[in-house]
Amino acid sequence: MVPPTVVRPRQGAASPSFPVPSYPIERVRLGNGLRVLFAPDRTAPVVAVSVHYDVGFRSEPQGRTGFAHLFEHLMFQGSANVGKAEHPKHVQAAGGIFNGSTHPDHTDYYELLPSGALELALFLEADRMRSPKITQQNLENQIAVVQEEIRVNVLNRPYGGFPWISLPPVAFDTFPNAHNGYGDFTELAAASLDDAEDFFDKFYAPGNAVLTVTGDFDPAEALTFVERYFGDIPARAVPAPGSFAEPVRSQERRERITDRLAPRAALAVGYRVPDPIGDLTGFLAYCLLADVLSDGDASRLERRLVQHDRSVTGVRASLGTFGSPFEQRDPLLFTLEARQSEDATADGVLAAVDEELGRLAHDGLVVGELERVQARVVSSLLREADDALGRAMSIAVHELRRGRPELVNELPAELAAVTADEVTAAAASLLDQGRSVLELEAGAAPTA
């Protein structure tokens, strides 16, 4: 384990000092544009390998809703030198685990294995980066698989897709920000082989990806493997990142949906926040505000809505509607989600939220409140970075979004530097904009 340093807050911030790791990070860029990050740590005999492609469901073409998710599935259907279903077999036979996931702004694939299997993981990832098996049979099979996922996880589950699928079309107007990234049955069924090949050619170029290796390995040996397997993958043009910008509304927008399976009404509220890339310092105040409002029994909305008013059975504040707050581009939402009690109304809950935000903006934080929240958030980041896989995913996202993989070491200091005034100003800003409100009406009989 790398010896920790001690981070002390700037003047006006909370008083605790946080020990944070200083993980070494080495950066290499191959001739084909592939960015490679090495973060060795000999603590445990495991390695994590991840490949992050700079494309998520906000970049998929209009008329092909869910295509980024579908293509993630296609990447597991074999490649030039790896048969169908052999990728999982190879990883599991080596004692490892694997997965992939599609996010608003990236798609990731990873393996976590014993350190002796590093070369295997790099070979597998390089082979599918070079030549995945995009065939009509694989396409049709995976369309059916994704459609079944939608049935199970959204259509036939209480609160399925709430609010990550159902709130964005209330909060945003453009297709990239508002559409359902999980997938639409009709548009998935219309996907063609040409669509898949075009998507691969455009977004799955080595120059549009970040390869990360963390854990128990020798960087010199790893670089030899990387150059052997990835070095001769042909370079292709990389799409320029488009803007998803939308203006912040001045008026509230409210919509209502019915969930035939939900036993209780629910409420989701979205507010706009500063650009998480262009204004990271400003954005971090909202990260702490989310925990001030809803993390733990002592948080403000937990005390007010759950314990005092008993208007909701649970409340959660978060940044974004899907994934880590640090992985997304602008715009994203500060989201409140609550499951209402039987006799509660959405207007009553919203009025109480406004009161608590106003009280926080006017009266400020109480003694020790910011320190408690900072300690929780920093502890969560430290736990995430403590294992090889969590570290790999964090490092890759920071490189992809900001070109700063070292943020895995620096974020605790950045959070410790946020002041109480910045958090209260963030609370005030939520009251000064037109929020987006989604009411979910219960369609099922209430449970006891």
Language-model regions, residue ranges each:
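An aromatic/glycine/proline-enriched structural segment found at the starts
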Residues: 2-13, 173, 181, 206, ...
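Acidic/histidine-enriched segments that form metal/cofactor-coordinating
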Residues: 2-8, 13, 53, 79-80, ...
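Active/ligand-binding-proximal structured segments within catalytic/core domains
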Residues: 33, 41-91, 280-293, 302
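Short acidic/His-enriched helical or mixed secondary-structure segments at domain edges of catalytic enzymes
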Residues: 147-166, 245-264, 307-319, 363-409, ...
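A structural supersecondary motif
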Residues: 268-272, 293-340
